[in-house]
From Swiss-Prot:
Designated name of the protein: Olfactory receptor 1D2
Outcome after substituting residue 232 to A: Abolishes nuclear translocation of ARRB2
Coiled coil residues, start to end: none
Keywords: Cell membrane, Chemotaxis, Disulfide bond, Fertilization, G-protein coupled receptor, Glycoprotein, Membrane, Olfaction, Receptor, Sensory transduction, Transducer, Transmembrane, Transmembrane helix
Length: 312
């Protein structure tokens, strides 16, 4: 398995962050705990929003979809990683690796685009409150979400198809927790210039443009908030954006730690940074969006109260 060219029938070895059995046991329980917290947190957000008519608004519509994306994202990577940590067989098939890569790339892009749309929603709510209902109509919300999905699916498809033309030689040991694009490209022994060029071009379109849009939106939002004469209204306006700003900072901060570096400098140490955006960010989002949100507190309280009453 260590020599020759990559074929569809061959495999990769996902070695994870450590090959020490003792450390692997610790990592297993740590990632299992994080996975369960992520699943429970995001499922509760989705159920609370879908079951409470008071939360059937654009901002919560996009939040529910962000939670669904995060739920799908961790399920794409962590279960396989947990199996590998408990098993002596750490192999993942070529097809399995490409499938994992496709969903990973697509869902990161989708997360990014939904955060950009949520920034636009906050901009309209703060800067144009009188036009909010018409500017963020249900039809437009569905259209924006559909556009996010289409662009993300195409983005993932482009990079996965390009990866199929890459040849891998020598060791196929991946010192990572999942099949990550930069790691696979580093293992290639064929020309990856096209992959690299397309990665930069599509990355600018899918990530940099939405990120710039988020920055501009928040500059305008902060300007609008500073013009509000009442201190209490200023605080209320800022608090409605604080959770989204926290999620944006966590997402882009962890993403920059991994991807804002030359391809040839990618190292095993980057696996820790990858865990931040692949595991920690989806786990933290439910806490960020519900911690200081009274509407979400109320919806979660009513949801849990209703289910506890059914049990008693």
């Amino acid at each position: 398995m260590d020599g020759g060219n990559q074929s569809e029938g061959s495999e990769f070895l996902l070695l994870g962050m450590s090959e020490s059995p003792e450390q692997q046991r610790i990592l297993f329980w740590m990632f299992l705990s994080m996975y369960l917290v992520t699943v429970v947190g995001n499922v509760l957000i989705i159920l609370a929003i879908s079951s409470d008519s008071r939360l059937h608004t654009p901002v919560y519509f996009f939040l529910a979809n962000l939670s669904f994306t995060d739920l799908f994202f961790v399920t794409n990577t962590i279960p396989k990683m947990l199996v590998n940590l408990q098993s002596h067989n750490k192999a993942i098939s070529y097809a399995g690796c490409l499938t994992q890569l496709y969903f990973l790339v697509s869902l990161v892009a989708l997360d990014n685009l939904i955060l950009a749309v949520m920034a636009y929603d906050r901009y309209v709510a703060i800067c144009c409150p009188l036009h909010y209902t018409t500017a963020m109509s249900p039809k437009l919300c569905i259209l924006l979400l559909s556009l996010c999905w289409v662009l993300s699916v195409l983005y993932g498809l482009i990079h996965t198809l390009l990866m199929t033309r890459v040849t891998f030689c020598g060791s196929r040991k991946i010192h990572y927790i999942f099949c990550e694009m930069y790691v696979l490209l580093r293992m290639a022994c064929s020309n990856i210039q096209i992959n690299h060029t397309v990665l930069i071009a599509t990355g600018c379109f899918i990530f940099l443009i939405p990120f710039g849009f988020v920055i501009i939106s928040y500059v305008l939002i902060i300007r609008a908030i500073l013009r509000i004469p009442s201190v209490s209204k200023k605080y209320k306006a800022f608090s409605t954006c604080a959770s989204h700003l926290g999620a944006v900072s966590l997402f882009y901060g962890t993403l920059c730690m991994v991807y804002l570096k030359p391809l040839h400098t990618y190292s095993v140490k980057d696996s820790v940074a990858t865990v931040m955006y692949a595991v920690v960010t989806p786990m933290m989002n439910p806490f960020i969006y519900s911690l200081r949100n009274k509407d979400m507190h109320g919806a979660l309280g009513r949801l849990l109260d209703k289910h506890f009453k059914r049990l008693t």
